[in-house]
Regions:
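Histone-fold recognition with a strong bias for associated Lys/Arg-rich disordered tails
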Residues: 1-125
Length: 125
């Protein structure tokens, strides 16, 4: 089960991808929306990470580099394989630790296993 806040963030990421006419819902869409979450912002602040730079990098990436996944017609974005893996990994972690529901920080941590994603690149930059 996922938290209500995470559901909202996933929906916003979906809407972002849909508004951009992207065929796929990517980790970059998700991370951009996660950057607006209060818990994630607190975590970044605690770690000395400037969320503004992550948002700027992600926005530029989505605008310029995701043109290859723009559909010719309106489509419902499909979650990418990496998006699905992150959700599954976070859910498995929460289930194995008996912590209840998947929250935004669980997703953020699970993203780090996707070493080849630009989302992780921007987080580590």
């Amino acid at each position: 089960m996922i938290s209500e806040q995470l559901e909202i963030i996933i929906q916003k990421a979906f809407e972002l991808a849909k508004n951009k006419k992207h065929e796929f819902l990517t980790l970059e869409h998700l991370l951009l929306e996660l950057c607006n979450d209060e818990e994630v912002k607190k975590f970044f602040s605690y770690k000395g990470i400037n969320v503004k730079f992550i948002i700027e990098d992600l926005t530029a990436y989505i605008e310029k580099k995701l043109k290859s996944i723009v559909a010719k017609e309106d489509v419902k974005p499909i979650p990418s394989m990496s998006f699905e893996r992150v959700l599954k990994r976070a859910a498995q972690h929460v289930q194995s630790s008996r912590k209840g529901e998947v929250k935004t920080l669980n997703i953020l941590v699970a993203m780090f296993s996707e070493r080849d994603s630009f989302a992780v690149y921007f987080l580590e930059k």
